[in-house]
């Protein structure tokens, strides 16, 4: 009891500052009364509203009386066998109906309510450019009411385990047991250079390629240690002149220099539309592969909508 008495003055003091006033006001209103108000408004009568809500007409009338105490208006005027709303009630209806619709949308577990819900799919900028056009088309075909948001990846495992994002699409490897994944596609690695690079005219000149200046992509995940080791064995003497975690930067740099870089094939296909890039044949490197997967919290599968979205994305690839 003492703690409640201490809280009351705090709420009173803060209510004058803005937002806390909302909670003070809502605490004094039974939100069920707003549902009854909407039922009477929509069905234009107390008896009809009582049937819809499975209540007695007397209970509906008592609720309207409570609303008349809260609001300085009679709200509904008897007209024939029903009631007609006052101008003030019409004004209230605009806001109450929108509020109830928003609540229904937020509580829409089964996806039966035709309002927008936001699904977050985190990616890096480069992976997003590669996969999100395909994902957007697929999701909009099956779930046109969904709104998609694409936040950045900061701490992938934490984002998923703490439900800060719904899905992550990347080539990362998670050790958290709550995070599950499905491989969407597997990509081959390619060696790229700019159009007109002198190396394009040389046939299988391993030594020249090995001695050329290289740009190195630095993936953070530990699961690439094996790939890095094998690439190092293929190019033991390569000269690393530039390193970056950003594959877009690497593509732009290669397109404007004589340096070489190793990137996944699908990124080459995408970037070659933006920059003058070419592939250098290197069969042993082209056999190297990298997986791109969709990652999610395993408890998200309890959500029918999110479960369906995951299936749609998997089928899109």
Swiss-Prot record:
Protein's recorded name: Uncharacterized HTH-type transcriptional regulator YbeF
Any coiled-coil regions, as ranges: none
NCBIfam families in UniProt: PRK11482.1
UniProt similarity note: Belongs to the LysR transcriptional regulatory family.
Gene it is expressed from: ybeF
GO biological process: regulation of DNA-templated transcription
Span of domain HTH lysR-type: 29-86
Gene Ontology terms for molecular function: DNA binding; DNA-binding transcription factor activity
Regions recorded as binding DNA: 46-65
UniProt keywords, alphabetically: DNA-binding, Transcription, Transcription regulation
A Pfam family of this chain: HTH_1
PROSITE patterns: HTH_LYSR (PS50931)
PANTHER family according to UniProt: HTH-TYPE TRANSCRIPTIONAL REGULATOR LEUO-RELATED, LYSR FAMILY TRANSCRIPTIONAL REGULATOR
Alphabetical list of SUPFAM superfamilies matching this protein: Periplasmic binding protein-like II (SSF53850), Winged helix' DNA-binding domain (SSF46785)
């Amino acid at each position: 009891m003492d703690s409640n008495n201490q809280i009351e003055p705090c709420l009173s003091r803060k209510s004058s500052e803005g937002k806390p006033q909302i909670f003070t006001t809502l605490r004094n209103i039974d939100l069920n009364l707003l549902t009854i108000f909407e039922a009477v408004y929509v069905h234009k009568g107390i008896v009809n509203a009582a049937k819809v809500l499975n209540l007695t007409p007397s209970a509906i009338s008592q609720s309207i009386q409570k609303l008349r105490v809260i609001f300085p208006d009679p709200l509904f005027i008897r007209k024939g066998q029903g009631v007609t709303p006052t101008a003030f009630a019409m004004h209230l209806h605009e806001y109450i109906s929108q509020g109830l619709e928003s609540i229904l949308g937020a509580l829409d577990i089964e996806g039966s309510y035709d309002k927008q819900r936001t699904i977050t799919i985190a990616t890096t900028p480069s992976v997003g450019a590669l996969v999100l056009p395909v994902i957007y088309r697929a999701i909009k075909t099956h779930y046109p009411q969904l709104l998609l948001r694409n936040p950045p990846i900061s701490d992938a495992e934490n984002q998923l385990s703490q439900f800060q994002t719904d899905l992550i699409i990347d080539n990362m490897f998670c050790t958290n047991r709550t995070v599950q994944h499905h491989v969407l596609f597997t990509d081959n690695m390619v060696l790229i250079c700019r159009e007109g690079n002198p190396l394009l005219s040389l046939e299988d000149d391993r030594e020249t390629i090995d001695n050329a200046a290289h740009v190195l992509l630095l993936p953070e995940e530990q699961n690439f240690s094996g790939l890095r080791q094998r690439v190092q064995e293929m190019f033991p003497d390569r000269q690393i002149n530039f390193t970056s975690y950003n594959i877009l930067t690497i593509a732009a740099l290669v397109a404007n220099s004589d340096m070489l870089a190793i990137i996944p094939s699908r990124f080459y296909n995408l970037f070659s539309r933006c920059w003058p890039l070419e592939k250098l044949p290197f069969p042993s490197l082209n056999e190297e592969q990298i997986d791109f997967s969709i990652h999610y919290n395993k408890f998200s599968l309890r959500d029918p909508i999110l479960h369906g979205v995951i299936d749609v994305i998997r089928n899109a690839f």
